[in-house]
Amino acid sequence: MTRVGIFGGSFNPIHVGHIALAKAILERCELDEIWLMVSPQNPLKQQDDLLDDALRLEMAQLALRDVKGVKASDFEFHLPKPSYTWNTLQRLSTEYPDHRFTLIIGGDNWAHFEHWYHWKDILRNYNVVAYPRNQYPGTIRMPLMEISSTDIRRRICQGKPIDGLVPDAVAQFIMERRLYVEQ
């Protein structure tokens, strides 16, 4: 049985904090792989500044190309919208019966987990790992990285550098395509 962590998010854009977190959870939770599930739509977030799905997926793939055990996935792009986690996990379990899935979420989401669609079913059928985020504790102890995609987008819009906040390949991709320049 392959143990896979499902780390969903907008990744708008993916940054070094996402990657460091995925690598740490991969090791600490004894998972075989982590799939960064690039979400086309989060039912709990407004989507005004969400970059096109294909661009966010391509940035994630660029960022992860040399990261062992972590890969970007477009699985949710092919599901009905909105893409609720319960539906995603059910479909993954059907399509990958030889995999055991663990849901990876932030402590901010964990604090409000009882509002999630089919939250009790998720807890009954899957492991859930919550990492500390935005002053919310998680179910595992990890150092917090004070990096956010929102701040990165703001820096780009203001003409400030993003060196060290995103992988070099992602920074180049963003600059070549002039992404997030006018938000």
Where are the language model's segments positioned?
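Nucleotidyltransferase catalytic core that binds NTPs
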Residues: M1-Q183
